[in-house]
Amino acid sequence: MIKGSRHFHFEQISELLEKKVHETILEVNLDAIVHNFNQYRSKLKPETKMVCMVKAFGYGAGSYELAKTLQEHRCDYLAVAVADEGAELRTEGISIPIIVMNPEFSSFNVLFENHLEPEVYSFRLLDAMIRETERRGITSYPIHIKIDTGMHRLGFQPEDVPAICERLRAQSGVIARSVFSHLAGSDSYVFDDFTHQQLDKFTKAAGELESGLEYKVIKHILNSAGIERFAAYQMDMVRLGIGLYGVSASGQKGLRNVSTLKTTILQIQNVPAGDSIGYSRMSYVKRDSRIAIIPIGYADGLDRHFSNCLLYTSDA
């Protein structure tokens, strides 16, 4: 109940509050996040660091709430997709190191003002970072060097390592805090030979980088599936992504579901046999049917191409 004199315009506040009430909600269980975090932590050596991926609004689970919880449970690093995500976390009081996986050249101000640590994957980006730190009078700003060992997205080539070392030794603006790569098929035994090729390439390239720079560089290549299946290669740090949210590549038992999508039924209709339902008449009922309409669609991430699919769980 909202009460007060008319000149306070409480009816406007009431309208705003009503707009905040949705019949479709995604519940996120932070206790499950902590449980999954500890499940993966138990597979690691005590000294192995962990990066947790909270990019893309925490895969829809709420980046700040996740980041705060992970910070409280001594996560070593967080990783976001773009600098703006990291800046928002800083505004909310997140203080642990944050890696920006896809830094844009236009985001340097945001990076430096919020002490966000960029992934550096090309000489163009490396040179731009060096110039910007020199212009600002900054020294030893942490960056994270990415090596492409077979994923073929972003990254330097392994043969670029000598030139990277030469560039880094010739300046004082940035320092390589870590070197890493990304496994392409660690979630399937079908690609194990390729995964081992990637691991071998990275081990060699990372060793060359560290030797050429003559200082300790954090090394990491394992993602969630890699932690489950290739823990022997945990090196100095691992990156926990989809596993944090309860999805296991190898069917690992013990992970807990993090998210629950809840909604209400708007209407129930009787549809005669032979009639179609929905866009493009993709679904036809073979018998007289009773259907329920729920308020979930594009805005909730449910694409129309998922039409005519059966969703089944023990709770359905």
Residue locations for each model-derived region?
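Anionic-ligand-binding alpha/beta catalytic cores of soluble enzymes and soluble regulatory domains
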Residues: Q198-R287
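ATP-dependent carboxylate-amine ligase
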Residues: M1-H35, A83
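Glycine/Thr-rich phosphate-binding loops of Rossmann-like dinucleotide-binding domains
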Residues: F10-E11, E88, F108, Y189, ...
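Active-site-proximal beta-alpha core segment in soluble small-molecule metabolic enzymes
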Residues: I25-E27, A32-V34, T48-I218, Q234
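Conserved small/polar residues in nucleotide/adenosyl-binding loops
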Residues: Y312-D315
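Short glycine-rich anion-binding loops that position phosphate/pyrophosphate groups of nucleotides
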Residues: S5-H9, D148-M151, S224, G243
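Glycine-rich phosphate/diphosphate-binding loops that line cofactor/substrate pockets in enzymes
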Residues: F37-T48
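A structural micro-motif recognizing beta-strand termini
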Residues: I294-G301, S307-N308
